[in-house]
């Protein structure tokens, strides 16, 4: 009881916990607000090293931020111009292709064992509605919720502009909402969270770009269909560690089944090689920062996915890093002292 009272009397812990609970409640009630804040934080953390690099070159605070934002908007517009048209062109035929794969049960050409066939049939029967429902959900998300999606994009872009210019003032505000006696502790906590989440987001973005581009290059080089949609799918799913790799490979595997045994083996080998390279890059760039247990990662993805929906799955690991720092800064010292 004495230890519990001691925890409650720790002002830094108490106010941090209070603000976390309030934030989660607001995000649950207003999912669009959650989406805007997630995207703003994501892009701000991506642009941060660009701004710091320009500032080191003595370009000045405002020029560095304007240049970083212009670079961001150019890359975004160019990427959308290059990606969206071919993805929309391929989407309908890709759905038809997936439907034919499941209807024809093409995996029967590869599975000769009568004992294994029922197992694969059950797996594929489970995957078919899940994959179809997800693809239809993504398509309807953009078409039927066009106003909501547009609102999120507009507020994200405006918010990003202000956040990039006033990041120090925003950081100071978060420190000022703590009692004066614990502001130094709060400042150190937010600095550690910013460093851990920033490094993670930049590394996972680099990995996603490497894997997405690799799929596009290989599919284009061998003149394979659906290069745009497969590479975009690989890029997006790789923002979800561990689970995303499985999600990434499901449509790739189904597509490779139509290429024969040699095609299946070559694409599987390519996937293994590119993920091995991405894993090495991830390990090297994440050295010295918070490490997360794979079980903790999976549980975080599941929990925050249930709590906040699709966006929750993508922010599961950054939030897990947040709580890892929270544990190290506030809870562990209190428990160790008792």
UniProtKB/Swiss-Prot annotation:
A GO BP annotation: transmembrane transport
Protein location: Cell membrane
Membrane topology, record value: Multi-pass membrane protein
GO CC term (a single one): plasma membrane
Entries under InterPro entries matching the protein: AI-2E-like
Membrane-crossing residue ranges in chain numbering: 20-40, 68-88, 147-167, 203-223, 239-259, 263-283, 297-317
Keywords: Cell membrane, Membrane, Transmembrane, Transmembrane helix, Transport
Family classification: Belongs to the autoinducer-2 exporter (AI-2E) (TC 2.A.86) family.
Name the record gives this protein: Putative transport protein TM_1349
Annotated source species: Thermotoga maritima (strain ATCC 43589 / DSM 3109 / JCM 10099 / NBRC 100826 / MSB8)
High-level lineage: Bacteria, Thermotogati, Thermotogota, Thermotogae, Thermotogales
